[in-house]
Regions:
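Alpha-helical propensity feature that highlights long, continuous alpha-helices across diverse contexts
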Residues: 1-78
């Protein structure tokens, strides 16, 4: 689903920017002391397990939007 994938990528990018602002950097293994995290890569380079985590967050967000009574309608092509 295009919207789920777009939201999942955004979720990851927002998370990564937050970590970077907190001083975290990429590292092959998570290291709290050195503030290294293997997930600090572009979304496209994540493995499917990590992408699925972000997709789950995106789906949860879409469910909340629907529960609140909103609908998402794509733009019509001109």
């Amino acid at each position: 689903n295009v919207i789920v994938e777009a939201l999942a990528e955004n979720v990851h990018e927002v998370w990564a920017q937050s970590r970077i602002q907190q001083g975290w950097v990429y590292g092959p293994e998570r290291n709290e002391k050195l503030k290294q995290h293997p997930g600090l890569v572009p979304y496209a380079k994540l493995d499917e397990v990590e992408k699925d985590y972000d997709r789950h967050t995106a789906i949860s967000t879409l469910k909340l939007i629907t529960k609140l009574g909103f609908t998402i309608v794509p733009k019509e092509n001109p």
